[in-house]
């Protein structure tokens, strides 16, 4: 199935373009999720194609999507990684970038704490935390513009459940990789804020959508987007991180 996915992605015209046919662009989403998909399959099946894909995705993120001039990882770039200076091209999705950071840190751990990957994952985490953490109200906001222009998406300053779960995981991996107490402090910061705002204290489960100030935007516990994935994954990955909290020599 994984090989079929790669074949579909590599076959021109087989899948509808994510962006307009007249706009040649690369997307961060498929690039980063293939790291995690290959990693999960590799835990059960050994196949060189999995390591190859992980290497290719990490190289693409470094080459195309990381933009030091903005200290940001962009969601959409030109074919050579150039900035597409439009509303969509300038978008930073902090939660998505933080998720990428822990995918890379997890791979660094798999490689006995590969220093280059640790450095890369930490850099993405720190960039994305700076863009995403709301210094006034707390929590990770949805979207930013790399030039600090107004963001087009109407939910840009809301707090969705899943960016918080990714930040909880990423900060634990960062602490595990470095033993730097600041990442443990960041973990406590995001964890405390998340558990103070998202769980329904009367009936259980989490709300999915908060206003910027942390009040509930709508009370649904699940919909076509919010399913039983990000929260249990956060709990499982955090538990496994806590089983071992010191980096390899």
Predicted regions and their residues:
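Aromatic- and glycine-enriched pocket-lining scaffold segments that form the walls
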Residues: 1-62
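Carbohydrate-binding/catalytic loop surfaces
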Residues: 13-33, 71-93, 137-162, 205-225
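Well-ordered alpha-helical segments within folded domains of soluble proteins
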Residues: 26-42, 91-109, 157-176, 225-239
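Surface-exposed beta-loop-beta
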Residues: 42-96
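Long, well-ordered mid-to-C-terminal structural blocks that present hydrophobic/aromatic surfaces
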Residues: 94, 98-137
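C-terminal hydrophobic structural anchor segments
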Residues: 156-205
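Conserved small/polar residues in nucleotide/adenosyl-binding loops
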Residues: 244-249
């Amino acid at each position: 199935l994984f090989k079929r996915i790669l074949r579909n992605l590599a076959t021109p015209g087989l899948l509808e373009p994510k962006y307009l046919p007249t706009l040649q662009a690369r997307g961060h989403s498929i690039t980063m999720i293939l790291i995690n998909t290959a990693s999960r399959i590799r835990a059960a099946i050994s196949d060189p194609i999995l390591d190859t894909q992980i290497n290719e995705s990490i190289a693409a993120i470094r080459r195309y999507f990381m933009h030091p001039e903005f200290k940001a990882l962009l969601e959409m770039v030109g074919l050579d990684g150039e900035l597409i200076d439009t509303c969509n091209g300038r978008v930073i999705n902090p939660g998505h970038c933080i998720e990428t950071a822990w995918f890379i840190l997890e791979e660094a751990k798999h490689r006995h704490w590969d220093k280059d990957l640790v450095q890369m994952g930490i850099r993405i985490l720190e960039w994305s935390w700076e863009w995403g953490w709301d210094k006034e109200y707390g929590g990770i906001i949805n979207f930013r513009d790399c030039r600090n222009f107004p963001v087009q998406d109407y939910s840009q300053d809301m707090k969705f459940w899943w960016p918080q779960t990714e930040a909880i995981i990423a900060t634990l991996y960062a602490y595990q990789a470095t033993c730097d107490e600041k990442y443990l402090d960041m973990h406590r910061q995001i964890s405390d804020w998340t558990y103070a705002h998202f769980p329904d204290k009367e009936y259980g489960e989490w709300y999915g959508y908060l206003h910027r100030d942390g009040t509930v935007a709508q009370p649904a516990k699940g919909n076509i987007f919010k399913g039983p994935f990000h929260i249990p994954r956060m709990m499982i990955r955090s538990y496994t991180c806590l089983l071992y909290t010191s980096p390899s020599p």
